[in-house]
Every structure is written in structure tokens, then in C-alpha cells.
């Protein structure tokens, strides 16, 4: 592979679509805390002055949707009307029904291991050894930039920052290896009083320089900081937000393929979410074991059927053992049936709200980020 550029973007927790994702997952967590077997598909829409929470939920739990919604918006930082959105005064509407019994009969089984998939679909997982968290560098650093924006906003370092922000990082590759950063874009909502020059200087010093490794920056690296010149109107006042509209931000920044299913607001019986987590777990353990430098896993399901309809392993020519052997190892060491992967990754806990901003992958405390099977895979593959 010759020289090329690759770009990924991220958005902050205050982006309208991410507000929606976090509300949906906050509702899911509150329900799972009381009822781990609940069936939850929670969708959220946000716009100026209102939040609509809808979907299909079947549970023995009772949760206060309005309180959860307001608390989530408050934690993000929308607490004054001058930001265009206020947790204390926005309307909260609820339109929630129950899961279809036609779906339910295909999922539930007397033997949990025979639990069927909640829907058909295809999911991908990916890992690469180009960063210490075995994630692509462009999405990793795009996330870290907007995480830093939230940090300096909340701790008062840059008090004129507002919650909505976006980042984008373009990396330079030569023969598949990172050689530098070509361009950085960071747009952040801000208070009226800050001027463009002061904002650009502060963002460079407090957000960009502490995050991006200096060895990847050079005289030709281009920086675009609030390139429109003004970003006062933002959040739900600037754009409406919907659950599940940032699926590439949530995953690998475009570096890997995507099956199309969103994550937030879905309980683990929905393989759109749980099987994508399991596929990441498989791919990461293969790379951590040194069996490949890059690995992409595809898995697919039929509704109501436990066994995956297919498993595919792609290593882009970086494999250290034959591809056929890798597929056999995946089938031997990973149970990718819906209930099997729920047990394997211990998914019936309220851990999902935290996933809903700054990426579902590459953050070591999530259970699908464990590399506990790497040595087993290495030994089974016969590598010294």
C-alpha cells in the first residue's frame, strides 16, 4: 500500500444525536438495574425545548422517564436557556409500548443457551495494533479531542465552552504505517463573549496540544478551529438529535465495515448491539494474541435462531497462521450464540450509558475490551 490519508470524526456528549443516545442508554440502565431480563428498545428525539422518548419496553421494572431524561441532560451541561436547551424547563414526552409477542416467542427459550437472536442482521468487529488500545488511530484521537473539550469545559479551565462539539483527524499513512497527522478539525460551541482569536489559541493550547502526539504534528499539519468563525447556536437548538445516528462515530470511524445496526437503547438480546461487542472482543483477542496485525470479524444471525448463520475472519494479509485455522479457533473459543455471548461478556448490567459518548470500543474498562483469551488462542495456534 502506498501513501494515503485516512480521516475519522467524533462528536461530544453535547451533540444532539449523542444527547439522544445517552438518554436512551440511561433509560436502559435504569431498567436493567431492576430487571436484567427486560426487553428494551428505547429511541429518543431531541429538539429545542423538548425531548421525546419512545420505543418498545417489556419489563417488571418501573422507572421515571422524565427524571432520567432531565438528569442526563443536566449532567451533559445544558442547564441554562442561553445555551438553547435547559434540563430544568424542557418538555419531556413519552410514547412507549411493549415488545411484540411475535418477536418474543422467537427469542425466549426454556433452555437459555437456545435463546434466539432478537432479529436478523450482520455485525462487524475490528482490531488493529496501530494503537495501544488496539483501535484505529484516527477515531481514537478524534474521541480524545472531544473528551478533552468536555473535560476543560466542566472543570472550568475554559468556562466559555458549551457542550456541543465535533472533531475530525486526518492521518497520513505510508505502507500501512502512521507517519503523521495531515489535518485537524475542531468545532466547539461557545459563549457569545469569546472572540475567535482567543478561542483558537485556547483550543490549540488546552485541547489539541495535550492530546495529539507531537511526533505526528509538523509544519505542514493543517488546523481548522471553528472554521465558520462562530458557533454560539448549537445543541438541540441548532439541530435535532436522534438515537442511533452516529454509528460510525460509535465504532471504528469508517476504518472497518458496519452492519448498519445502532447500539444505544437496546438490551443485550438485540444482536445489533451484543454481537457487535462480541465481534470486537474476538477481533481484539486475535490481534492481542499476535495472530494478526489487523482483524475484522463478521457474524450474522436469523431471528429466533441461536447459532450464527455465518462467521467470517478477515486479516488483510497480516495473519501469522492460516485464515481457515483462525475461523476454527473463533468457533472453538468463543460462544457467539446470543445467550452465550451475553454470559461471556456479562452484559446484563447497567453499563451502557457510559458507552453512549466517545465510542463503544477502545475503552479498557468495558468487558468486551478484555484480552483474556489471547494466550489461549496463541497456545492453540501453536505460536511460541
Curated annotation (Swiss-Prot):
Pathways per UniProt: Amino-acid biosynthesis; S-adenosyl-L-methionine biosynthesis; S-adenosyl-L-methionine from L-methionine: step 1/1
Sequence positions that bind K(+): 43
Keyword check for Metal-binding: yes
Organism placement in taxonomy: Bacteria, Pseudomonadati, Pseudomonadota, Gammaproteobacteria, Enterobacterales
Keywords: ATP-binding, Cytoplasm, Magnesium, Metal-binding, Nucleotide-binding, One-carbon metabolism, Potassium, Transferase
Record's function text: Catalyzes the formation of S-adenosylmethionine (AdoMet) from methionine and ATP. The overall synthetic reaction is composed of two sequential steps, AdoMet formation and the subsequent tripolyphosphate hydrolysis which occurs prior to release of AdoMet from the enzyme.
Gene: metK
Enzyme class: transferase
Protein name: S-adenosylmethionine synthase
Record organism: Citrobacter koseri (strain ATCC BAA-895 / CDC 4225-83 / SGSC4696)
Amino acid at each position: 500500500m502506498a501513501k494515503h490519508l485516512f480521516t475519522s470524526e467524533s462528536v461530544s456528549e453535547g451533540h444532539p444525536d449523542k444527547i439522544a443516545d445517552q438518554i436512551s442508554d440511561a433509560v436502559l440502565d435504569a431498567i436493567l438495574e431492576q430487571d436484567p431480563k427486560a426487553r428494551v428498545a428505547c429511541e429518543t428525539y431531541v429538539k429545542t425545548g423538548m425531548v421525546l422518548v419512545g420505543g418498545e419496553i417489556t419489563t417488571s421494572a418501573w422507572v421515571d422517564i422524565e427524571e432520567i431524561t432531565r438528569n442526563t441532560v443536566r449532567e451533559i451541561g445544558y442547564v441554562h436557556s442561553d445555551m438553547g436547551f435547559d434540563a430544568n424547563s424542557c418538555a419531556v414526552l413519552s410514547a412507549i409500548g411493549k415488545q411484540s409477542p411475535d418477536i418474543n416467542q422467537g427469542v425466549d427459550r426454556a433452555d437459555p443457551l437456545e435463546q434466539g437472536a432478537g432479529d436478523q442482521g450482520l455485525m462487524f468487529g475490528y482490531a488493529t495494533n496501530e494503537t495501544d488500545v488496539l483501535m484505529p488511530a484516527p477515531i481514537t484521537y478524534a474521541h480524545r479531542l472531544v473528551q478533552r473539550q468536555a473535560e476543560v469545559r466542566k472543570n472550568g479551565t475554559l468556562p466559555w465552552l458549551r457542550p456541543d462539539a465535533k472533531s475530525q483527524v486526518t492521518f497520513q499513512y505510508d505502507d500501512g504505517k502512521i507517519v503523521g497527522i495531515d489535518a485537524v478539525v475542531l468545532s466547539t460551541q461557545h459563549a457569545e463573549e469569546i472572540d475567535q482569536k482567543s478561542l483558537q489559541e485556547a483550543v490549540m493550547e488546552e485541547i489539541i496540544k495535550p492530546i495529539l502526539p507531537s511526533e505526528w504534528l509538523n509544519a505542514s499539519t493543517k488546523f481548522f478551529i471553528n472554521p465558520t468563525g462562530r458557533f454560539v447556536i448549537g445543541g438541540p437548538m441548532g439541530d435535532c438529535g436522534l438515537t442511533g445516528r452516529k454509528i460510525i462515530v460509535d465504532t471504528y470511524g469508517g476504518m472497518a465495515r458496519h452492519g448498519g445496526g445502532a447500539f444505544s437503547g437496546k438490551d443485550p438480546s438485540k444482536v445489533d448491539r451484543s454481537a457487535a461487542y462480541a465481534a470486537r472482543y474476538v477481533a481484539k483477542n486475535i490481534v492481542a494474541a499476535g495472530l494478526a496485525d489487523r482483524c475484522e470479524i463478521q457474524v450474522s444471525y436469523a431471528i429466533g435462531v441461536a447459532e450464527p448463520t455465518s462467521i467470517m475472519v478477515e486479516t488483510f494479509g497480516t495473519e501469522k497462521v492460516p485464515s481457515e485455522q483462525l475461523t476454527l479457533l473463533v468457533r472453538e473459543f468463543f460462544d457467539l450464540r446470543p445467550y452465550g455471548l451475553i454470559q461471556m461478556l456479562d452484559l446484563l448490567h447497567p453499563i451502557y450509558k457510559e458507552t453512549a459518548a466517545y465510542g463503544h470500543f477502545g475503552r479498557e474498562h468495558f468487558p468486551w475490551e478484555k484480552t483474556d483469551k489471547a494466550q489461549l488462542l496463541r497456545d492453540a495456534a501453536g505460536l511460541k
